[in-house]
């Protein structure tokens, strides 16, 4: 639990705990799929253990003067949750996502699925995570997974705007929010670059948010010319691996990370080569 009290660029890591939990779930399902389908009681129990971390609050961190910000976060999540009322399936859900998840649920890893249907090769970690959130014929929990990323995105912007002491970050958060408002009145009704709430079976925005957070932390470190702490290195590397497992394009973030660690690259590589390289190779 001590790690959750850490701050990277003054941003409380505890606010990213839902992402950490989903990353853990994805890795457990991915590894276990070499031996069994994910529709297995043992996989469920092991995968859902970290959810308890999301209810952890260190008492001395809670301050009543911040109750307004806490309520704003809760209100943001509630408003986003209203999307569940009218959400529909994306065409990719029927095309390959749900079928891929069904294979993950019922079978051990099936090699060469892309030879059967090329779009099976487009699956990502989202399908491994989503495979344990089926509820009979109701797929609303898959939509909730998308809402986790959207909620984290807005919680991050609220932090930058109202809690950060940096004028630059306040302006960045305000600029992103202002762009989102303007995009609602763009060509053909907007959605010309800003994130939106994905329909069920799509995870483009999940990757976009992971990529945004990853490169925010990297750029902030580069801007301040700060030495990268080992724990911050692991957090950034975790975000990079998570984004790569959603979209291979996430590897671009390694360029910025390499600039951060260029002076002590051997030390950092020795720290990361076993856990992250192992998970990366399993994913490939």
Residue ranges and their predicted role:
Residues 141-148, 182-206:
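Membrane-embedded glycan-lipid processing machinery
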Residues 1-63:
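Membrane-embedded, hydrophobic transmembrane alpha-helices
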Residues 206, 211-231:
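Membrane-interface transmembrane helices that cradle and orient dolichyl/undecaprenyl
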Residues 68-80, 264-284:
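Hydrophobic alpha-helical membrane-interfacial segments at the cytosolic entry of transmembrane helices
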Residues 80-176, 195-198:
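Active-site lumenal/periplasmic loops and adjacent helix-entry segments of GT-C-fold
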Residues 60-64, 251-277:
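Perimembrane helix-loop-helix junctions
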Residues 49-52, 214-215, 240, 251-263:
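Hydrophobic transmembrane alpha-helices of multi-pass, membrane-embedded glycosylation machinery
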């Amino acid at each position: 639990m001590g790690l959750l009290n850490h701050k990277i660029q003054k941003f409380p890591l505890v606010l990213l705990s839902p992402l950490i939990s989903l990353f853990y779930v994805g890795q457990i399902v991915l590894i276990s799929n070499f031996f069994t389908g994910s529709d297995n009681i043992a996989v469920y129990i092991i995968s859902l253990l970290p959810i308890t971390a999301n209810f952890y609050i260190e008492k001395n961190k809670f301050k009543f003067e911040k109750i307004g910000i806490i309520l704003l976060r809760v209100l943001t999540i509630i408003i986003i949750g209203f999307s569940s009322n009218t959400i529909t399936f994306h065409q990719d859900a029927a095309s390959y996502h749900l079928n891929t998840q069904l294979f993950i649920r019922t079978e051990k890893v099936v090699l060469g699925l892309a030879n059967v249907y090329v779009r099976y090769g487009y699956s990502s970690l989202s399908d491994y995570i989503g495979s344990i959130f089926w509820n009979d014929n109701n797929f609303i929990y898959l939509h909730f997974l998308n809402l986790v990323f959207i909620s984290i995105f807005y919680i991050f912007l609220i932090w930058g705007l109202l809690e950060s002491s940096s004028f630059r970050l306040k302006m960045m958060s305000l600029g992103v929010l202002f762009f989102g408002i303007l995009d609602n009145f763009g060509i053909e009704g907007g959605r010309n670059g800003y994130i939106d709430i994905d329909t069920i079976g799509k995870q483009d925005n999940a990757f976009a948010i992971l990529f945004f957070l990853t490169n925010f932390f990297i750029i902030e470190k580069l801007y301040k010319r700060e030495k990268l702490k080992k724990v911050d290195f692991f957090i950034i590397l975790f975000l990079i691996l998570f984004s790569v497992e959603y979209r291979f394009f996430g590897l671009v973030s390694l360029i910025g990370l390499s600039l951060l660690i260029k002076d002590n690259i051997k030390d950092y590589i020795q720290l990361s080569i076993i856990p992250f390289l192992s998970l990366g190779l399993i994913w490939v």
